[in-house]
Amino acid sequence: MKVSRIFLVIFLSGIFWLVIAQFFFCTRFQYKQEASAFQGNIIYNPYANINAANWEKCNFHAHGNAWNGLTNGSGSAADIHRVYDSLNYSVHCVSNYHQIDTVDAAQQNYVSAYEHGFNLMKTHQLVLGGRDVEWLEYLFPQTSNNKQDILNYLSLDTNSLVILNHPALRNGYSDKELSSLTNFNCMEVLSPYGISEKQWDIVLSAGKPVFVVGNDDMHDIYNKEQVGRMATILNLKNTNQASVLSALKKGEGYGIVLGKTQDPFQLPELMHLLVKENKLDLQLSEKARSIDFIGQNGKLLASFSDRKNVQYKLNTSDCYARAKITFENGTQIYLNPVFFTNTTNFAQVQNPINFTETIIFKVIGTLLYAAWLLWAWSFINGGRSSKSNRYEIPTFPDSTFPEFN
């Protein structure tokens, strides 16, 4: 009986510790009450220095068999690389959960990758270029402080790049959190688990230079429907890891969703996007059914039909403008934003630590867990029901009580 109580206490103590660690021991931060839009005297154009001959197709999010089949993924890393090579992808990663695959590490186009997160709400991040896996995680539905704490730890390696994965899935990031969280470089706007266009505009409207990524998020390499449907197109002179991460951080690329009849070997491309005297000049390799310019708070700024070349004048009130391009066969291109700024150093403003709240919550958490351990010790030892602690009611012979007439 006592052995079963011990095992029960150990199990419950572990669960209680996870709760205490997540909601009381996690660092707490101070967040801006209002987001700041893009503003400044400079217009940043991520396509200012591109060469239309240097577009390369990339996929950074794919899962194979890992952890002895415990996670969702079919096929080996070698299978994944072989299939993406056959579809003319210049860069393709295996991004298993909390595991950096090194099968192709000797290849010139190798980029280290892993997906971080095994929590209930699928609040996940993709880490590219990391040397080690970060194991800090919070299992239960996460608070803003939990998410910021994880992003801070993932960003400690300044050579790596952090991407918010499928933010629209299960509301992994709320609208308010997207406005306030920092320390991520890109967003997986294009995913088979949801197009996070609204979420991207929330981030951009908060004045954060976060650039688009499109990925297959493939879990079965043998399923043709999961492969080659979404991609990131980067402008690269070299396909090594340093060049790939640099292009992603500068926004020198775009996301693409392939229509069902789209030839994967003959994709429409951006020829140029020039900015002169606040006027944007966009040129495509083929005519598009529609070209929409979208700005602050997701507002439609302008729309054009049946064109391959368009111009739009960017106003300071627009703050930013990004183009969404749709072709007749359903293929869509999502360009990165052109925006007003005073600097091209895109280091995001950090959310400072709220030391007072952090200390108070840690003290409360410590007291709660200490109280739990005291109760657990009492429970294991039978509580107040043991003979040594039981109160015995004394008995008296009948003669000791007086008789009343």
Across the structure, where does each feature detected by a protein language model lie?
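A metal-dependent hydrolase metal-coordination microenvironment
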Residues: Q22-P167, G172-S174, S180-T182, E188-V203, ...
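Glycine-enriched alpha-helix->loop->beta-strand junction motifs that scaffold or abut catalytic
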Residues: L181-M187, G207-F211, M230-A231
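Residue-level detector of solvent-exposed, low-hydrophobicity positions
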Residues: N68, D104, S191, E197, ...
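Short glycine/proline-enriched coil/turn segments at helix->beta-strand junctions
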Residues: A105-N109, T158-N159, K208, K287-R289, ...
